[in-house]
Amino acid sequence: MPDRDTPTADTESTLLHEANGELSLHFNFPTIQSRMLKVDPDRLVLDYTRTMMGFLLLQPKPKRIVMIGLGGGSLAKYCRRTLPNSEFIAVELSDEVIALRDEFRIPPDGPRFRVLCGDGAEYLRGDAGLADVLLIDGFDSEGQPPGLCSPAFYDNCYAKLNAGGVLVVNLCANDSACGCYVGRIRSAFDEKCVVVDAEDGDNKIVFAQKCNTFPPGFNELTERLRKLETIHRVDLDKTAQGMLRQERKRRWGRKATKQKA
């Protein structure tokens, strides 16, 4: 199949590219925002999306999932198919991106699945109700929008989660402010936070939970993984290993700091 580059009618910053049976969405070429395998549209092709599904290790049966940033809808489609009892709401600022939902085989709205056009930060500030999982994957042609990475935004994310709720944030690893954003999330969630590198190294996925004990220990994670792997073949074992590895590093760092003091 020949390559196809198709800018949307209203903006030159949103670009579709089709090649080798894959359809990709770009906000700032050549950076890929989303990628879909046309013969298997619900498959999570990009590794950062598979890492983000690690929220299942912390919240295996979410009743309500809210996602900020739709993109090509990879996570939205996967959650709708594999978590049919969960309500899923995606909030996307760009109507041009939403207009591409048919190209990316994003299902129509229904009782448990909705795509809303609006500002994600404003949506959470309003009467949005509480969620069990918040997925933050909002980017534009400039990168991370300021409204989706401020201290006030992360504080509001904490407030909008049920007890035990999980925040998952996709960050660009090469963003000079990445460490600052992680610090803001740690502050909002009282240090109940761990950062896992996506396999390609281009993304850092932050998991934070509104709970007293975090993260789960080895035995608990192993048991959850055993139950989840029969349904979710999305490298949850790698994400679990990343969580445990980063938590060990954090604890060692604390011990070293105390010893120096």
Please place each PLM-identified region on the residue numbering:
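SAM/dcSAM-binding transferase cores
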Residues: P2-N20, S24, I32-V39, L46-D47, ...
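The AdoMet/dcAdoMet-binding core of the Class I SAM-like
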Residues: D5-T8, A19, L23, R43-A159, ...
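A short, flexible beta-alpha/helix-coil linker loop
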Residues: P30-S34, F139-E142, L167
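Short histidine-centered beta-strand/loop micro-motifs
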Residues: S34-L37, R125-G126, D197
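A generic structural signal for alpha->beta connector loops
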Residues: N85-E87, G110-R112, G164, D190-K192, ...
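C-terminal substrate-binding/active-site "lid" region of AdoMet-derived donor-dependent transferases
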Residues: P145, P151-P215
